[in-house]
Amino acid sequence: MPICLKGDERRVKLLFVNACPRGEDSRTLRLARTFLNALTALLPQCEVTEEALYPAGLTPVDAALLARKEALCDRRAWDDPLFAPAVRLQAADLVVIAAPYWDLSFPSALKLWVEHCYVRSLTFHYEGSRCVGMCRGSQAVYLTTAGSPIGENDWGAGYMQAVLKALGVARFTALSAQGLDLAENDAGALLGEAMARAAALAEEIAGNEKARPI
């Protein structure tokens, strides 16, 4: 339901990309909900749209789908359902991605989402040989949890930062809870500490959004 705003409050569109296969049992999703609850409490004009990737069942981009996509791009047929994820990304002021740390990166559904969001003349265009992003977002937040330490193998966050930067979202913050499955660690305490950092990050971002000119 649209939020009714008072006075000169600026509506903030937030896209929440939920790439958590375990649903509400996911520790990553719990971390994300903590962040989103804190942010929307501080920024009541924030409108959250959730892109739940597992019920979405995005189709892998094969040769036939790629040909259809290119033809639709040529016609700028942005109302075609194929472009719905890209349209939502392009319009978002804030992008929040929740994805568990799997196999040195993230679940495959998130890569499918990226493939559906790279849309010529909608989320990016070319100036000569240079790719220029067209998304309006000012900030992206990437939230993840890992059973083991991630260390230098943070390929998922690094990849998503590069993708979003290419599409025009320059500011990127990654936040994680790591080592949750190690016997010597207190998983609850580690997750709780990450949730506290998530709430603090939400406060920082809410302050930045309130300071932006209307």
Regions found by a protein language model. Name each.
Residues 21-23, 147-150, 181:
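Short histidine/acidic/glycine/proline-rich micro-motifs that form metal-
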Residues 19, 145, 177:
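Cofactor-binding loop segments of dinucleotide-utilizing enzymes, especially the Rossmann-like FAD-
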Residues 13, 47, 138-139, 171:
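Residues at the starts of beta-strands that form the adenosine-phosphate
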Residues 126-169:
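Short, glycine-/small-residue-rich phosphate/pyrophosphate-handling segment
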Residues 120-124:
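Short catalytic/binding micro-motifs of nucleotide second-messenger systems
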Residues 157-214:
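Glycine-rich phosphate/pyrophosphate-binding loop and the adjoining helix
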Residues 61-64, 153, 185:
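Short, well-ordered secondary-structure micro-motifs
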Residues 2-99, 104-119, 196-214:
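N-terminal beta1-alpha1-beta2 submodule of the flavodoxin-like/Rossmannoid cofactor-binding fold
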